[in-house]
Amino acid sequence: MNATPASADDLIVIGKIYSVHGVRGEVKVYSFTDPIGNLLDYKTWTLRREGSVEKQVELVSGRLQSKFLVVKLKGLDDREEARLLSGYEICVPRNLFPDLDDGEYYWYQLEGLKVIDQLGQLLGKIDHLLETGSNDVMVVKPCAGSLDDRERLLPYTEQCVLAIDMAAGEMKVEWDADF
C-alpha cells in the first residue's frame, strides 16, 4: 500500500468498503458506479475515512456477487487487516472519469448548482443526489437568497430540469415552490 494519494480536492467517491469476505483478506465493496462493475475499471484507489485522505491501494481482482463486489487488494492477505478497512470510502481522481456527451453530467458536477424555478425564484442549492430506482432525486437545500428555508426533493428528469448552465452555476427547473 502506497502513502502518496492524489489531492483531496480532485477525488470523487465511487464506492465504500463495508466488510470482509472470507479469510484471505478480500473485502466487500458497495459500488456507487453504474453499472456496479465499473468501479473495477480503476486500478488504483485512494481510501479515506471521515473526509481525510488516508492511503492508496492497488486493485488485484474483483468480482460481482449479488449487489456488491468482492475485491482483492494488493498486499492485503489477512482477514483482520482487511477488517480495518471497513467504512473507508473509495475515491479516484476526477480526471480519470470518461468524457460524457453534451447534456450529460456526473453527480459531483451538479452538486452546488443554484436551483431556480420557472418564475425566477431561487429554491436553493443542490446538496447531493439520491438514486431511487425509478429516477435520480436532487436534494435541494436552502442557501443565501433562497425563497424560504425548506429542503426540497426534486426529480432529476427531463420534465423537471429545463436547463443547466454550468458556467453560471445554475439549473432552471419546472417546479411549484409550494410543493
Curated annotation (Swiss-Prot):
Location relative to the cell: Cytoplasm
Tree of life domain: Bacteria
Protein's GO biological process: ribosomal small subunit biogenesis; rRNA processing
Keywords, ordered alphabetically: Chaperone, Cytoplasm, Ribosome biogenesis, rRNA processing
Pfam families, per database record: PRC_RimM, RimM
Domain PRC barrel: 102-179
Matches recorded under Gene3D superfamilies: PRC-barrel domain, RimM
GO molecular function: ribosome binding
Signal peptide: none
GO cellular component, one term: ribosome
Domain notes: The PRC barrel domain binds ribosomal protein uS19.
Family: Belongs to the RimM family.
Function: An accessory protein needed during the final step in the assembly of 30S ribosomal subunit, possibly for assembly of the head region. Essential for efficient processing of 16S rRNA. May be needed both before and after RbfA during the maturation of 16S rRNA. It has affinity for free ribosomal 30S subunits but not for 70S ribosomes.
Subunit composition and interactions: Binds ribosomal protein uS19.
Protein name per UniProt: Ribosome maturation factor RimM
Taxonomic path: Bacteria, Pseudomonadati, Pseudomonadota, Gammaproteobacteria, Pseudomonadales
